[in-house]
Amino acid sequence: MQFIDRITIKVTAGTGGHGKSAFRREKFVAKGGPSGGDGGRGGDVIFRVDNNMNTLLDFRYHRKFTAKNGENGDIKNQYGHNAPPCIVKVPQGTLVKDADTGEILADLTELGQEAVIAKGGRGGRGNAKFANSANRAPTFAEFGEPGEVKNLLLELKLQIGRASCRERV
């Protein structure tokens, strides 16, 4: 079995869903107000320590991790769903660094420990959020914000076990 203790990967968090620009339409309501819903939040990229892994060999051929995007808003003030996070399993003792700046983002030493490495984008607001006393029927909505994109350097720290030896007399 080959042992890999340092590798570079790329993670991309999800983009937020777009807000909707829509208006209320009913049979006997001539001028319905704005009814566009907000977009959902993009998925985060989370690193989780897994007991079943002991090397970074799994990342050798799978170097890009992308979270899903949030859903767009819809008519009748319906919000878009938030995207689920992308869980990346790493071995115990993994040090996560930003490959561009060298900043340490996380030191994952305990089993089950989690760290949010890349945050997902915020969802855009629908036109119902922009209605006020001066503009009661806005025709615009916001786009969702993009998620974070990071190049990471994963390093596996050496774990030394203590063994006691007795001398024979």
Placement of each model-derived feature along the sequence:
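Conserved small/polar residues in nucleotide/adenosyl-binding loops
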Residues: A163-V169
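Conserved P-loop NTPase architecture
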Residues: M1-R162
